[in-house]
Amino acid sequence: MVQIPENPLILVDGSSYLYRAYHAFPPLTNSAGEPTGAMYGVLNMLRSLIMQYQPTHAAVVFDAKGKTFRDELFEHYKSHRPPMPDDLRAQIEPLHAMVKAMGLPLLAVSGVEADDVIGTLAREAEKVGRPVLISTGDKDMAQLVTPNITLINTMTNTILGPDEVVNKYGVPPELIIDFLALMGDSSDNIPGVPGVGEKTAQALLQGLGGLDTLYAEPEKIAGLTFRGAKTMAGKLAQNKDVAYLSYKLATIKTDVELELTCEQLEVQQPIADELLGLFKKYEFKRWTADVESGKWLQAKGAKPAAKPQETVVIDESPSEPAAALSYENYVTILDDVTLESWIEKLKKAPVFAFDTETDSLDNIAANLVGLSFAIEPGVAAYVPVAHDYLDAPDQISRQRALELLKPLLEDEKVRKVGQNLKYDRGVLQNYGIELRGIAFDTMLESYILNSVAGRHDMDSLSDRWLKHKTITFEDIAGKGKNQLTFNQIALEEAGRYAAEDADVTLQLHLKMWPELQQHKGPLNVFENIEMPLVPVLSRVERNGVKIDPAVLHKHSEEITLRLAELEKKAHDIAGEAFNLSSTKQLQTILFEKQGIKPLKKTPGGAPSTSEEVLEELALDYPLPKVILEYRGLAKLKSTYTDKLPLMINPKTGRVHTSYHQAVTATGRLSSTDPNLQNIPVRNEEGRRIRQAFIAPEDYLIVSADYSQIELRIMAHLSRDKGLLTAFAEGKDIHRATAAEVFGLPLDSVTGEQRRSAKAINFGLIYGMSAFGLSRQLNIPRKEAQKYMDLYFERYPGVLEYMERTRAQAKEQGYVETLEGRRLYLPDIKSSNAARRAGAERAAINAPMQGTAADIIKRAMIAVDAWLQAEQPRVRMIMQVHDELVFEVHKDDLDAVAKRIHQLMENCTRIDVPLLVEVGSGENWDQAH
């Protein structure tokens, strides 16, 4: 692995940072409507880099305005790129001012690109013996790498020295230009040689050498072993001019005339009064407070600035990154005395992080192999209890370790933090330990801060927040069929890995928690919804649900027969046999042999046979309709009727789904193994699957389902008098809407008119256009638009809400639920019209869907609290969409159903009544 020498010259590709930040961070604005997201992102990245390496010399280099020498060489150079978005352009000048106020030299040289300036400074520094660290995400910079010049990509925390360049690109740094010249570079519109891709370019360069050698000895190319080698010499000959033009375009200049030398790029102390003014103007409130309190952490060796300044610490960066993640203060505990000593330390800590190590991802089946703890950054311990490889040292027995730890783990007053603690709670339950004092979960902290900012697993969060690449499980256990389980891993490696998990978790919490505390709404959601939900979901998962395999087996046999009938029908329509599961064969049948006009194409250019396309084609052609039914049944068979019996846990005789709190953008729960959300709701096949979810003897399944909850939330949010009145009076909302839209008395509304009104009601929740409504109702677009216009005339509050929400989303970059959950919309200001329109639709729907998610989560918490206190033999067994499902003893049915109904309808207050429909039966279908 590359070691970064002390105090390197840091050269930052500012233009690369700018675009990356613009696309990676939410489109934030200040109260004046000025965009700030890219500025915030660049400063975040710069700050982390400078504070991690603390250089005495650095520069941030941007592209200058105007054309460069490459534009003169090739008129199409970068010509495919869209113009810089206005909201990004507006941030450049203030960003430059902030970079300078941070004390960092800033360069932009006309006629060349930032890469050329960086290349020149890097080579100059190398000549005088100074190590260089270039921060960039651009692959063409790899040509500059030497033993003294290293690249770092702060977005992925990847560091490239000469060996890493070879591993990544297949060629050494000195052949990167040749590599790009041959294969081209689509990001810069460098053409390359037609027909030469990455693999071919690697084969040519590895086999013979650079471009000059290839053209000097073309006869040797045919002797290489890659596919197409025999004709490659001819292709190269035909495109020699293009190859050498591409070579020139890809070459980074290292002889740009500069007014400054690398030794003059000294990092100065921040100019606090300038930073303060800029931070206040653009409303970087936390940074403003840091400047005012004098906490800006300067780089070591910084020279005094010409103006008075204060020092600022930005709390998202690790205070001592090198020490905090050095592993020096990690211990492996092998005896009772040391463990008891650590338990005392853990009791006294304001909060400690802990993690379990096991031999399975299934927490019910998992065996505990060890536990790790961290009490402060960089101070962590691992307690192995079941490593059983040959010559493994003696360890504290699992029984003894848990006996010592149980009082601590069950103490409600001792606050704990973890990453996905629901899993660890489940593991400990296998050994009779009820984990209490669950105060924080870093996965949920990240999710609540921004659900769409990226993945919320520990490795990703460590990269993003700590700029630290964690030890991965594959690093210590290997891959594939020979991968070890954790109990087989040597303690030296296992201890470091496990202790790091706890250490990183604690450090992540210390970084994210102050950020979360600054936002009242998200903090409320975290403290009062997501964290209390963790033990509730853990209980629901452990309860599981009883499945009748015989029902599923019979259903599967029937589906098999129906699939055979559909296959024959499809063959008859097509006039020949073909594989209905083969996309390629289906494309041939539909679009070539039947002559149907393709509606869409795949990214690869082939005609699409997606479900959406087939649904549209099915309106006019019989075969797509058959294919859709075949696909739907085949998926049900493979996902549910065949698979569910295999998921029955041999220990419990039940199926235990896993619920995920940190997956969807809106706050909805998702589930896997099995995915309960995808069981069809309104067709016979879905009903048949639900019939296999059964109650044990003397029990019944009880289903409690919120009725039309998102429409009710729409009424509350829009404050539309017509909708509020209809719900308050308990009217059939779809019939009431039809009466308003069509100008009829309620009792004159036909079934068809009610269906149209229902499509409008639910369509508007999801931002449906007139075109979408016309397709759904199979009516002309003008007629659909007329329906929508009539709707908005009758319910003007809904239109006002939609317009208001779109405007707020564009201004803030996010929308909120009633509880304060923030739902960020990165594409709300996208220059891509389709992506922008999608974000606008999401802006309308997200507050409703997110509020519905918050409501059912509050209901789960309220019902669970009652069950734990008063009804221990009632089990909550599933949560699906807006529905909670229970197992209730027959003797308790009436009282329990009534209380669940009350708790769910009153768990939150909105301006229309929440309506819960409760049913019961021997199986889920009967109860639903």
Swiss-Prot record:
EC number per UniProt: 2.7.7.7
Domain 5'-3' exonuclease intervals: 1-323
Any Pfam family hit: 5_3_exonuc
Entry-linked Gene3D superfamilies: 3.30.70.370, 5' to 3' exonuclease, C-terminal subdomain, 5'-nuclease, Ribonuclease H-like superfamily/Ribonuclease H, Taq DNA Polymerase, Chain T, domain 4
Keyword Secreted applies: no
Enzyme class, UniProt record, top EC level: transferase
Region (Polymerase): 521-928
Stretches the record annotates as Klenow fragment: 324-928
Keywords: DNA damage, DNA repair, DNA replication, DNA-binding, DNA-directed DNA polymerase, Exonuclease, Hydrolase, Nuclease, Nucleotidyltransferase, Transferase
One GO process term, biological-process aspect: double-strand break repair
Domain 3'-5' exonuclease: 324-517
Record flagged with keyword Nuclease: yes
Catalytic activity: DNA(n) + a 2'-deoxyribonucleoside 5'-triphosphate = DNA(n+1) + diphosphate
GO molecular function list: 3'-5' exonuclease activity; 5'-3' exonuclease activity; DNA binding; DNA-directed DNA polymerase activity
Self-association state and partner proteins as the record states: Single-chain monomer with multiple functions.
Function comment: In addition to polymerase activity, this DNA polymerase exhibits 3'-5' and 5'-3' exonuclease activity. It is able to utilize nicked circular duplex DNA as a template and can unwind the parental DNA strand from its template.
Family from the record: Belongs to the DNA polymerase type-A family.
Cross-referenced PANTHER family: DNA POLYMERASE I, DNA POLYMERASE NU
Name the record gives this protein: DNA polymerase I
Organism the protein comes from: Salmonella typhimurium (strain LT2 / SGSC1412 / ATCC 700720)
